[in-house]
Amino acid sequence: MCIRDSTYPDDCVLLVDTYDTLKSGVPHAIEIAKEVLEPMGKKLKGIRLDSGDISYLSKRARAMLDVAGLTYVSISASNSLDEYLIRSLLNQGAQLDSFGVGENLIVSKSSPVFGGVYKLVAIEKNGQIIPKIKISENTEKITNPGYKRVYRLFENETGKAIADLIAFYDEEIDCTKDLTIYHQSDIWKFKTIEANTYTVEELQVPIFEDGKFVYQELSVKEIRDYSMQEKARLWDEIFRLEFPHNYYVDLTKNLLDFKIKMLEEKRK
């Protein structure tokens, strides 16, 4: 442990539950922090709990670190965590600063399979874009035909997102007019948004043009900041763990009508 800590003194997080968390792991972490890192002018970044009663152990470990004057040392938890276990730990008052989520982040346990297909939606012939469609017995695998763009609609009053909207590429959304948006498969589900009560942002941006990379790459921090900013524009109800509010990706009337027309023609 001493070799590792002296080699990587600026980013040292110690796993403390390998043998005995409270009798061995945490005391040795305190020893490393006080006798190895602090004399180097460095600080132990944190400790990690990966087994046992994490809520109880985090409280005891926090107290031990604080008594030793190591209030700056953070405590993280891992061990097959998911959103429900994390919520439970927080509700129990666990003294944790961060969570390491692995296997339950790779695949969504509640929806492990994403229904969909990646198919041709148009061809270019003699300078014209000709829409194409894939037909399937499963509605989620029926493609939306044509060259398209995606918008996000926001309420003017709250600044919150209403829905995303897929439109033909040459369709312009006029915010001074009423706008009716339609469910992609359940065509009786639609919503009309009154004129001058919403704004529109286009979501797609060019990455390559004529074979050239034209996108301005962002740093990890910029990506995180943007994600947090966009998350704040969604309703809190979308993030409920139980019975969350659905956020829809709808179609314009033009696109829906054209899709239905193509389906009817292909099924004749």
Task: Describe the function of each predicted region.
Residues 4-71, 81-85, 91, 105-107, ...:
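Buried, small/hydrophobic-residue-enriched core segments of structured protein domains
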Residues 73, 81-268:
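Gly/Ser/Thr/Ala-enriched C-terminal appendages of enzymes
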